Structure formats: C-alpha cells, structure tokens
C-alpha cells in the first residue's frame, strides 16, 4: 500500500511548572506511524493517552516539539502554520471534530458552512458552480436541501454532524481525521452517521484516521488499529488480529473491557496500581509498568521498543512474543 501519511519520531511536549522548576508534559513522545492511501486506521486509548494531540499535530493545528509529518513525501512540519494554511496541501487533510456545535460558526447557515472551505481552499467564488458544489456535497452526506438555509442552533445533533462532515469532504481531501465524531450523539443517530462515514470512504477513496474510545466502532470501520498509552504507541495490528489476539497487556485489558454477553462471568484483566506521570517520565522505563499485571524488572530499566510480533503486528512489550502478551514474573 502506498503511504499517504508518514509520521517520523513525532513528539509534542508542553512546558509546565512543577515544584517551582521547569518541566515538560509528554503528550506525544517519539511516535512513528504510516497511513496508507485509502486505508482506514483507528486510534484508541484512554483519556490522556495523546489521541487528541495527535489529531492536532496531523492537522497542523499545533507545531511539534520534534519529528516530522509527511504528506505524499512533503514535510508539512517544515512549514509554518500560516504557510500550511495557505498551501495546496491544506485541503488534503481535513478534520471532523467531536462536537459539531463547537466547530461550526454559529453565524453561518449550513450552506455558508459548506461553502467556506471551497472559497478558502479552492478559491471558488459565489456563483452557479459554488451553488452546485454545495448542494451536491449536502446530498452526498444525506443533508436535505431545505436545511441549507438553517443556522446550527436550528439543526438537530445528527444534522449538525452531517454539516460538519460535508464541509470537510467538500474539498475532496486525501485524509479525513475523525476525532470522536459521534460521541456527542444519541446512540440511534450514531449508527446512522457511522454508516454514512463507511459509505463515504468507499465512494470517495479517502484515508481515515478514526479516533475513538469506542472499540466496537473502531472494529467496524477500521482495517488497522493503533493503541496509545501516555504518549506512546504500544500496539499496532490489523483490526481483527488486535481484537482476537492482542499482545500488549494494556490492549488486552481494553479488549477484555468490551461488553460481551458471551464472556459473562469470566475473569477479566484488571489495571491496578498507579499510572506513570506524563510529566518528565523516566525515558528508560516502560510507561505502563505501574499498572501492568505482567511486568518484570527489565521494564523499569529498558523502554520496550515497538517490534514485530506477527504479520503487520507490532507491540511495545518485552514479553509480547508470547501469545498471552507477558509473563507472570514480577
């Protein structure tokens, strides 16, 4: 598969004050990732794992501390944010945010919201072609034409979500980053929007980076899954492999926590202990060690590298070559 996005040694550290001295919060730490052309990749992990920071880095909404983001071989991080915003590459990466209510301009009608990126990124002027493009995009996402003259507060949650998706796909991006796009919606509406997203990817041949805490949704929509913990990638695998044979203890706990009536009564992995602080963490220790039920002394002295444990399957655990993802030694 031809790479569309290549992330190389990407880091984002935030300077903070701790005990009266300077320190750094490691939101994303030395991440490598590739997203192929037409591929749908899921990004999962608990709150604070770095998912949202990755969204902002890939969308060039913030600058990295170190590392590169390449789009079709072009280094986006070599540009200032202002230069990127006016570059031809800007239209190739679009983001659909968690809450359309927050991301839509309240003074823009739905028509204006969809037209805005066409003006800014494609240089289209008001006229017949603009009108045709907006209406065609609205139809593509299932937004009735009569709703195009309404303001966001006059639309339902599902309708606002469709407007947010429409304004992102209107410029025909190569990569659509979806940051928890359905989490603010009712369950019944979520299902409809998820079907829409699956249909759009098939029809428009876009790549997806789907960020979610809902593993069932990720399993449904994504061909490959990336698991993050405290700024680090701990596992990457084809979706079915990750859900049926996870190798990292953290991934095993996430998968075991998915509600499943067939496993009722079974013992599930528990994550006890104290999480490692993301503030200046020990570079020589596994970030997950404080909560890991299968850690050993080596985990405190050697950061486990992300290494192959199977076909297209990688895990950052010293014991991941074991099919059970660890050892019981402590």
Q: What feature does the model see in each segment?
A:
Residues 75, 128-146, 199, 255-256:
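Conserved ABC ATPase "signature" region
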Residues 151-155, 159:
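Conserved ABC ATPase signature
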Residues 170-174:
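A short, proline-enriched helix->beta-strand linker immediately N-terminal to the Walker B motif
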């Amino acid at each position: 598969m031809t790479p569309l996005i290549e992330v190389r040694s990407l880091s984002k550290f935030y300077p903070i004050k701790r005990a009266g001295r300077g320190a750094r919060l490691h939101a994303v730490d030395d991440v490598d990732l590739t997203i192929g052309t037409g591929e749908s990749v899921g990004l999962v992990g608990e709150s604070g794992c770095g998912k949202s920071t990755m969204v902002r880095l890939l969308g060039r909404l913030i600058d990295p501390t170190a590392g590169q983001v390449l789009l079709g071989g072009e280094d986006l991080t070599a540009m200032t944010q202002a230069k990127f915003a006016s570059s031809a590459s800007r239209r190739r990466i679009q983001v659909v945010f968690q809450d359309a209510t927050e991301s839509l301009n309240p003074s823009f009608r739905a028509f204006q919201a969809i037209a805005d990126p066409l003006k800014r990124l494609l240089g289209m002027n008001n006229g017949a072609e603009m009108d045709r493009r907006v209406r065609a995009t609205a139809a593509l996402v299932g937004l009735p034409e009569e709703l195009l003259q309404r303001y966001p507060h006059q639309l339902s949650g599902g309708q606002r979500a469709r407007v947010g998706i429409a304004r992102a796909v209107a410029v025909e991006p190569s990569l659509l980053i979806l940051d928890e796009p359905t989490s603010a919606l009712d369950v019944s509406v979520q299902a409809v929007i998820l079907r829409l997203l699956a249909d759009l990817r098939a029809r428009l041949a876009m790549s997806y980076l789907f960020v979610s805490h809902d593993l069932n949704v990720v399993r449904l929509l994504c061909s490959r899954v990336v698991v993050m913990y405290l700024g680090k990638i701990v596992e990457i695998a084809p979706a079915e492999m990750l859900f049926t044979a996870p190798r990292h203890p953290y991934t095993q706990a996430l998968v075991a926590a998915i509600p499943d009536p067939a496993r009722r009564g079974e013992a599930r992995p528990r994550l006890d202990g104290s999480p490692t602080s993301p503030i200046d963490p020990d570079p020589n220790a596994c970030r997950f060690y404080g909560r890991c039920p299968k850690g050993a002394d080596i985990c405190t002295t050697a950061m486990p590298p992300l290494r192959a444990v199977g076909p297209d399957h990688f895990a950052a655990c010293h014991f991941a070559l074991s099919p059970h993802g660890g050892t019981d030694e402590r």
